[in-house]
């Protein structure tokens, strides 16, 4: 595990790791206590400790979150060997100014009436915990790690891994 990071360092590290990931998996708890995950389109906004997603006001996830607001959001970038798991508290936000700030025309696939769509709402996740893995991603790194492990009997550099409270 890596060295302890300050709050600002942890937020900056996570922001860098999730910046280009276009789809995240949002996991909520159903009324039966089961975990339910679904893909969510990420928004082009700098991570500052909060995550934002557009959602339909009457989608099943909204009901689940109103009942049990603790959620997990997972980001995966296998090409770069980066993985992030964020936990926090979700809430539904109705804010037309924030909608306008975060809106992207590609979202019309889900909200045909655009910013005027009556179903349009924001889901805000206030992140309070994170765990991430940032491994060397090049083929050369993997070969060097393999050779190092064979020669020394010790595993190669697993990269950066940390659990942080935000």
Q: What are these model-derived regions, one by one?
A:
Residues 3-23:
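Short, basic/aromatic recognition patches
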Residues 16-31, 71-75:
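A short, Trp-centered hydrophobic/proline-enriched beta-strand micro-motif
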Residues 48-52:
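Short active-site oxyanion
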């Amino acid at each position: 595990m890596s060295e302890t990071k300050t709050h600002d360092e942890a937020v900056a590290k996570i922001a860098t790791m999730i910046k280009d990931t276009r789809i995240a998996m949002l996991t909520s708890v159903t009324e039966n206590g089961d975990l339910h995950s679904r893909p969510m389109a990420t928004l082009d906004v700098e991570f500052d400790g909060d995550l934002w997603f557009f959602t339909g006001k009457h989608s099943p996830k909204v009901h689940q979150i109103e009942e049990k607001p603790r959620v997990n959001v997972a980001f995966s970038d296998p090409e770069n060997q980066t993985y992030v798991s964020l936990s926090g508290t979700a809430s539904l936000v109705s804010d037309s100014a924030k909608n306008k700030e975060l809106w992207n025309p590609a979202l019309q696939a889900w909200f045909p009436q655009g910013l005027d769509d009556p179903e349009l709402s924001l889901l805000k996740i206030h992140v309070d915990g994170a765990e991430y893995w940032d491994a060397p991603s090049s083929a050369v790194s993997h070969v060097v790690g393999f050779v190092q492990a064979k020669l020394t009997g010790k595993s190669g550099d697993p990269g950066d891994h940390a659990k942080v409270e935000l």
